[in-house]
Every structure is written in C-alpha cells, then in structure tokens.
C-alpha cells in the first residue's frame, strides 16, 4: 500500500499530469523519510511494554473521500484545503495526534481523496480485563500502559461512531 501512496508504483487509473498536485498533509519526524519508517518510529517511541507479535496489526490505512460529485463541488468551490484540514483534525482527535503518522492527498485520480496511516496505540485497561472481573482467579492488575490494539480501535461500535463523527466534523 505504501508503494501506491508514495507513487513508487503508478496505478493505471492515475493522471500523470496531475501527480504533482498530490501532497503530504502530515510531516514526518526528523530522520524519518517514509511511511514505513514513520510507523516504526511511532512504535519505538510509544513506550510499549509488551512485545509486538509478528502477526500483530501495526498500522491501519484509512481512505477519506466523498462521492465524485461531492468532491468535484468541494474542489470547484475552492474548499479542498479546508476539507483536508477538517479531516486531518478529525483524525488527530479520533486516533491521537501521535498515532497519525501519515496523511496524503491524492489529486491524480478521478476523485480527490486522503490516504491516512494510523498506528493503533491505545491507553487504558483491556476490554478482556473487564470481563475477567467476575472470574474466579484474580491476577495482579497492572497500571494502564500504552499498548498496540487494532481490535479496540477498529471494533464494530468504533467504526459506526467514526462514520457518524467524521460526517459531522467534515460535512
């Protein structure tokens, strides 16, 4: 997916005369030059205590867009920058500013859209821990620490809430 976002592999549905209009909406930290390194940097600086499993989700890719007609209207009214700023603001508020490692506006495809990359780091007790309160065995409770958990960030209830909130926030 990074190859598509960074245009190291050019999809057939792009217009090469508009590729120069694509732009990064989030700057990488110093010493970081691409999305893969930005994800690694976030994982290394998040203060995670647990080992990251080899099959564990380390990043979530999100595409933000509208219908072709809606996006043409936004672009035609000169409100594309405002639309981008509203979406980046929503992403930061929803997933955390530190967890949003990349956002790129693609203008070289038929419909303008944003590709965002989020590292799913959450704080607080595990959802499973809440269920274990009624269990027979009690384990020592640990202080809440940052943890990598895509299941919590992308639960069904969260996805419904995100759809409602992003529509309200970005119109």
Walk through the language-model features, giving the residues of each.
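N-terminal nicking endonuclease/strand-transfer module with a His-rich metal-binding environment
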Residues: 1-171
């Amino acid at each position: 997916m990074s190859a598509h976002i960074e245009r190291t592999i050019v999809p057939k549905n792009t217009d090469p005369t508009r590729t120069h209009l694509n732009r990064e909406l989030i700057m990488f930290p110093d010493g970081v030059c691409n999305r893969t390194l930005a994800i690694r940097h976030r994982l290394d600086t998040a203060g995670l205590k647990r080992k990251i499993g080899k099959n564990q989700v380390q990043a979530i890719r999100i595409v933000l867009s509208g219908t072709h007609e809606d996006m043409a209207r936004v672009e035609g009214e000169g409100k594309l920058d405002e639309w981008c700023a509203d979406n980046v603001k929503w992403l930061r508020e929803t997933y955390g500013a530190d967890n949003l490692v990349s956002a790129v506006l693609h203008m070289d495809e038929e419909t303008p859209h944003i590709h965002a990359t989020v590292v799913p780091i959450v704080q607080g007790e595990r959802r499973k821990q809440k269920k274990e309160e009624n269990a027979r065995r009690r384990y020592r409770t640990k202080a809440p620490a940052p943890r990598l958990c895509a299941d919590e960030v992308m639960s069904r209830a969260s996805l419904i809430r995100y759809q409602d909130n992003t529509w309200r926030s970005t119109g």
